[in-house]
A protein has these predicted regions:
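PLP-dependent class I/II
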Residues: 1-9, 14-19, 26-39, 45-61, ...
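Short, surface-exposed loop/turn segments at secondary-structure junctions
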Residues: 69-71, 297
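Long amphipathic alpha-helix in the N-terminal Rossmann-like dinucleotide-binding domain
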Residues: 75-82
Length: 411
């Protein structure tokens, strides 16, 4: 019998680059094993508890043996009806729960399976750069070619999107969008989606929008849904996850709504890949969507307090980062004295010298290499401690005087 060769290659895996975030994660764990107190802003993993009424519903329903069997790939009808009501209440949009809604095992699973179901080898997909990794590599895993569209300061993203469609050959089959953005926290207004839908119809391009941060918004701003655009469901679908709005990241539950053909495609491939998520989780999701939404406001308010402490502290250190109006992230441009290092080496330096762990922007795409991302997952006292560590690093590098705070040179 022939032995398995360790040199055997797997083409699909070979298309995936090394996961940059693993580098900083391993360094963080090594530092903690040495007894160092590392303040961790790296992963967007909510640190708060799931609201009690949702947990109680899960526990109650899980006691019923009739809920322990296989679920359905589309999700239980009651949850799909709750999703429909959620869209009506929030956005005044009618969603048919039978044909235009499907439950997913978190957005990440749904996005990956949708691309696997709809993309062929040789298809082109437009993706913002920088972007959440599954937006890029879901298409890569499916065998498609990714064309990056710069999502950077000083560049009109819609104009770049339109230019990419005109200049791509073969014509793009799909575009992946996500606003408010992870990692950049960039936001758009409804007018942007109106132009996107018109563009997609003109060039026959499918639109997939990831609305993960719909509720993590600040200062009175509201995140629009692409489904608010008349005719959007002709070309578009939208994902939402309960991970951030309800502190349910580990529960792995979300949904997709919109275009019937794409909903059917996702349902078809999920019928082969899974039997849906655990029924008690789905019933608990109904409790989340239809229960008192004060918990959602409280979660957003907590992130706002952390945002304010971090941005104020970094400004005091001379690091003039932008104040995000949504998401749970601060997208921080690397200060000029460190710019040549690139985001990975700068992240390593922050870890070593400031005891602060962040995500290097290069992990979200080449255009992210000028930035690092802070996730607002530490409490305010820990954030202040992180700022002190960063100030100490700047001071040691001669960028701050021992008594006075001086603004770092801008890039």
């Amino acid at each position: 019998m022939a032995e398995f060769s360790p040199e055997r290659r797997f083409t699909r895996i070979d298309r995936l680059p090394p996961y940059v975030f693993n580098i900083t994660a391993e360094l963080k764990m090594a530092a903690r094993r040495r007894g160092e107190d590392i303040i961790d802003f790296s992963m967007g993993n909510p640190d708060g508890p799931t609201p009690p009424h949702i947990v109680e519903k899960l526990c109650t329903v899980a006691q019923r043996p009739d809920t322990h069997g296989y679920s359905t790939s589309r999700g239980i009808p009651r949850l799909r009806r709750a999703i429909s009501r959620w869209y009506q209440d929030r956005y005044q949009v009618d969603i048919d729960p039978e044909s235009e809604a499907i439950v997913t095992i978190g957005s990440k699973e749904g996005l990956a399976h949708l691309m696997l179901a709809t993309l062929d080898h040789g298809d082109t997909v437009l993706v913002p750069n920088p972007s959440y990794p599954i937006h890029i590599y879901g298409a890569v895993i499916a065998g498609a070619q990714v064309r990056s569209v710069p999502l950077v300061e000083g560049v009109d993203f819609f104009n770049e999107l339109e230019r990419a469609i005109r200049e791509s050959y073969p014509k793009p089959k799909m575009m992946i969008l996500g606003f408010p953005s992870n990692p950049t926290a960039q936001c758009v207004e409804l007018e942007f989606f109106e132009k996107v839908v018109a563009l997609a119809k003109r060039y026959d391009v499918l639109v997939v929008h990831d609305l993960a941060y719909a509720d993590i918004v600040y200062d009175g701003w509201k995140a629009p849904s692409i489904m608010q655009v008349p005719g959007a469901r002709d070309v578009a679908v939208e994902f939402f996850t309960l991970s951030k709005s309800y502190n349910m990241a580990g529960w792995r539950i979300g949904f997709m709504v919109g275009n019937k053909t794409l909903v059917n495609a996702l349902a078809r491939i999920k019928s082969y890949h899974d039997y849906g998520t655990f029924t008690p989780l789905q019933v608990a999701a109904i409790a989340a969507l239809e229960g008192d939404q004060q918990c959602v406001q409280d979660i957003a308010a907590q992130y706002k307090r952390r945002r304010d402490v971090l941005v104020k502290g970094l400004h005091e250190a001379g690091w003039m980062v932008e104040m995000p109006k949504a998401s749970m992230y601060v997208w921080a441009k690397i200060p000029e004295p460190y710019a040549a290092m690139g985001s990975l080496e700068f992240a390593k330096k922050l870890l070593q010298d400031a005891k602060v762990c962040v995500s290097p922007g290069i992990g979200f795409g080449d255009y992210g290499d000028t930035h690092v991302r802070f996730a607002l997952i530490e409490n305010s006292d820990r954030i202040r401690q992180a700022v002190r560590g960063i100030k100490s690093m700047f001071r040691a590098d001669g960028l701050l005087s021992s008594k006075n705070v001086a603004e770092l040179p801008e890039t």
